[in-house]
Regions:
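Compositionally biased, low-structure terminal segments
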Residues: 11, 15, 44, 75-76, ...
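Active-site beta-loop-alpha junctions of metal-dependent nucleic acid enzymes
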Residues: 1-21, 26
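Extended amphipathic alpha-helical interaction segments
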Residues: 19, 25-28, 34-159, 178, ...
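Short amphipathic alpha-helical segments
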Residues: 9, 31, 162-166
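Basic, amphipathic alpha-helical segments enriched in Lys/Arg and hydrophobic/aromatic residues
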Residues: 149-223
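Flexible, glycine- and charge-enriched loops at secondary-structure boundaries
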Residues: 3, 7, 49, 160
Length: 224
């Protein structure tokens, strides 16, 4: 738990992961200014991927797409041809040129959006460099909504330390509880806990988990 989402907080988080021998290849996040410098300090070889959902939402808000039709066609074309169909470098180039050529005439505002995407192209499409890497934070956002729902039943904590202990217990439970309702490409996760796919096979099994009655993990081939 950290009091603010700043470079210091991210640095401490990454350092703890480093101390646990957790090898980070990619960090998927929204556009927080402190993440990149913190990542470079601890995991200089790791890549940053900006969340497409957040990035597109910022453009949608800037252009008032939900309430005005003026830029709606531009936005839908951008989302389709660049962020959905842009599954490799060539398609990204083609998508950007298509939108620039057909939807930005005489509009410096729209042209600036395209040039900004080109300028930040690497952090927007780094996910293509790692197989099955997500390009959004939907999963963690869903996880956070579950946590927020659980916190509604808690009246309060006596101290920051007690809140930290409660959160640790919540995370342990969530990490060791088998999935039951996964569908589509995530269906294989059912009957497995998330810890099965991340913990190293040679890792020491914490006593606290044994005390909680969590003493067996059925490692799958996905954890190799």
């Amino acid at each position: 738990m950290y009091p603010a989402e700043d470079e210091m907080a991210f640095s401490q988080l990454f350092q703890k992961l480093y101390d646990l021998n957790y090898d980070i290849k990619m960090v998927v996040a929204d556009d927080r200014p402190g993440i990149k410098p913190a990542l470079n300090k601890v995991f200089p070889y790791a890549k940053l991927q900006l969340c497409h959902v957040h990035y597109l939402e910022n453009i949608r808000t800037e252009l008032r797409v939900r309430t005005e039709e003026r830029y709606r066609h531009f936005f839908n074309s951008l989302r389709l041809h660049v962020f959905i169909e842009g599954t490799d470098e060539k398609k990204i180039d083609q998508g950007l040129e298509h939108v620039l050529r057909n939807h930005t005439a005489h509009s410096p505002k729209l042209q600036d959006i395209i040039w900004e995407i080109k300028r930040r192209r690497e952090v927007l499409f780094n996910y293509l460099k790692i197989q099955d890497c997500p390009n959004n934070t939907n999963l963690i956002e869903l996880y956070n909504s579950h946590l927020a729902g659980r916190l509604k039943t808690v009246k309060g904590f006596q101290s920051f330390f007690s809140a930290q202990k409660w959160l640790n217990a919540f995370l342990i439970r969530r990490r060791t509880k088998p999935f039951t309702d996964c569908e589509g490409k995530f269906k294989y996760l059912n009957k497995h806990s998330s810890l099965e796919f991340t913990i190293k096979k040679q890792a020491f099994w914490p006593d606290v988990l044994t005390k909680l009655g969590i003493s067996k993990i059925n490692f799958s081939e996905k954890s190799d």
